[in-house]
């Protein structure tokens, strides 16, 4: 049962970090082709 809690905490932390990094970047990216998006 603890493994489930630890997995949930890890996934939620990674998701929050990715969310913050993704939305912290302002749309001031130089005009490059949009094919860089994975």
From Swiss-Prot:
Subcellular location: Plastid, Chloroplast thylakoid membrane
Protein name: Photosystem II reaction center protein T
Subunit structure: PSII is composed of 1 copy each of membrane proteins PsbA, PsbB, PsbC, PsbD, PsbE, PsbF, PsbH, PsbI, PsbJ, PsbK, PsbL, PsbM, PsbT, PsbY, PsbZ, Psb30/Ycf12, at least 3 peripheral proteins of the oxygen-evolving complex and a large number of cofactors. It forms dimeric complexes.
Coiled coil: none
Pfam families membership: PsbT (PF01405)
InterPro entries: PSII_PsbT, PSII_PsbT_sf
Predominant place of localization: plastid
PANTHER family: PHOTOSYSTEM II REACTION CENTER PROTEIN T, PTHR36411
Protein function: Found at the monomer-monomer interface of the photosystem II (PS II) dimer, plays a role in assembly and dimerization of PSII. PSII is a light-driven water plastoquinone oxidoreductase, using light energy to abstract electrons from H(2)O, generating a proton gradient subsequently used for ATP formation.
Transmembrane region(s): 3-23
GO biological process: photosynthesis
UniProt record similarity statement: Belongs to the PsbT family.
Any one annotated GO CC term: photosystem II reaction center
Mode of membrane association: Single-pass membrane protein
Keywords: Chloroplast, Membrane, Photosynthesis, Photosystem II, Plastid, Thylakoid, Transmembrane, Transmembrane helix
């Amino acid at each position: 049962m603890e493994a489930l809690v630890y997995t949930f905490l890890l996934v939620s932390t990674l998701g929050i970090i990715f969310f913050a990094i993704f939305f912290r970047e302002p749309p001031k990216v130089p005009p490059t082709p949009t094919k860089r998006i994975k």
